[in-house]
């Protein structure tokens, strides 16, 4: 469960390292964001000499959460960290590589480009 002021790791090579959630997009007045939700975030840490810099406002999709995700078949998935991938307005990732495993549910949410870049889909 991601709420405003939550710090997230960045799971791609766009240049940012840490994000802080500001707002949850498209969920009305929901308090928490879950796997596959799009958030508005600010970059808190970034790699020098990269296109993205600190204090930039960006959009990101959540790909890993510490909170458990229960599937219809009874399987429960939980990750070690909260992580997101930075996307543009069309929903395409800004980076060219994705680090770590991501959930299969992103394919059903039309983030197929992110799923194709990921090394492991759980």
Curated annotation (Swiss-Prot):
GO terms for cellular component: chloroplast; cytosolic large ribosomal subunit. Gene3D superfamilies: Ribosomal protein L14 (2.40.150.20). The keyword Ribosomal protein applies. It comes from the Eukaryota. Its main location: plastid. One of its GO terms (biological process) is translation. It is found in: Plastid, Chloroplast. The keyword Cytoplasm does not apply. Transmembrane segments: none annotated. It holds the Pfam family Ribosomal_L14. InterPro entries: Ribosomal_uL14, Ribosomal_uL14_bac-type, Ribosomal_uL14_CS, Ribosomal_uL14_sf. NCBIfam families: rplN_bact. Binds to 23S rRNA. Part of the 50S ribosomal subunit. Belongs to the universal ribosomal protein uL14 family. This is Large ribosomal subunit protein uL14c.
């Amino acid at each position: 469960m991601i709420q405003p002021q939550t710090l997230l790791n960045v799971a791609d090579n766009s240049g940012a390292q840490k994000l802080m959630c500001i707002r949850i997009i498209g969920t009305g007045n929901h308090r928490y964001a879950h796997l596959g939700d799009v958030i508005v975030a600010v970059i808190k840490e970034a790699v020098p000499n990269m296109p993205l810099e600190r204090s930039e406002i960006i959009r990101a999709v959540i790909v890993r959460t510490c909170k458990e995700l229960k599937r219809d078949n009874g399987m429960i998935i939980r990750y070690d960290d909260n992580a997101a991938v930075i996307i543009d307005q069309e929903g395409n990732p800004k980076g060219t590589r994705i680090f770590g495993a991501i959930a299969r549910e992103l394919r059903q949410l039309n983030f197929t480009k992110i799923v194709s870049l990921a090394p492991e889909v759980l």
